[in-house]
Amino acid sequence: MSYTTTDADALDDQLDYQVDLVSEISVSDEESAQPTTITENFTASQNNDSAKREKRKKQRQKQKERKRAKLLELQDTNASIIQSPDTLSDLLNNYIKSIYSDLTDVELSDKVIKASYIEDTISFSKPKTVDNYPEYIQHLPGFTKKVVQNSNPEILVLCISALRAIDVLKPTKSLQNKNFKVAKLFGKHIRLEEHINYCKANKIGVGIGTTPRIAQLTNECFTCENLKYIILDYSFRDIKNNSILTSKESRKAVIDFLTSKTILENMAERKTKICFY
């Protein structure tokens, strides 16, 4: 018995076969799209995790900054209490070197502020607030509520700004009497000529103001023969957390004034001392 081999492709059963191309394409598209979707989801997840980590990092950084600011505030408030004249002298001399960096060592030596030029007020243990200014001033050795000569102040208080000077002035006015004026010495709304006339006509016990105006008055009308103390309003910090020595606007004026010929000679002769409040 013989068998005939038939090629399946050659078999014509006269039936039409239709291939579901749409279904095949859909399946194909789903299969090809699936890896992309997974990748996109994974990438999105990574981005979210990265954003969360960055947010946590920023939050930790802000917490550190807040803690640091509180610590600095605490240290600054007590700075002039816990620091000795030697330390404060070094502080001022470092600023002097920084500001007059173009001077030679010999020239800088003429501007050195010695520890003996700084009054040791460690024994005044009360907080350095504006309300305690009158008591602090009365605590200074040799303080009297009597000025001998017009235009010859006994105490000058250097402040970072006119607004701060006004704050210091308010409680300190309690020290004022006929022969001991507490004067506001800043340029805002007051002309230099007006200040000169006022100082020449009055006995200034405490002059409170900004360094530029006080320096002008020192050059124009103050004799400084009886100047006992220059108080730096050092503990106060402005809205930018600057002190009178760290603020660019006030630092150079303060150092220029403290190292001026008149003031340095007074300090060398032990007539005048610097105080940190």
From Swiss-Prot:
GO terms for biological process: ribosomal small subunit biogenesis. Residues 28-68 are annotated as: Disordered. Its main location: nucleus. Pfam families: CMS1. One of its GO terms (cellular component) is 90S preribosome. Residues 33-49 have a biased composition (Polar residues). InterPro entries: Cms1. Keywords: Nucleus. It is found in: Nucleus. Residues 53-68 have a biased composition (Basic residues). May play a role in the regulation of DNA replication and cell cycle control. Belongs to the CMS1 family. This is Protein cms1. It comes from Schizosaccharomyces pombe (strain 972 / ATCC 24843). The gene is cms1.
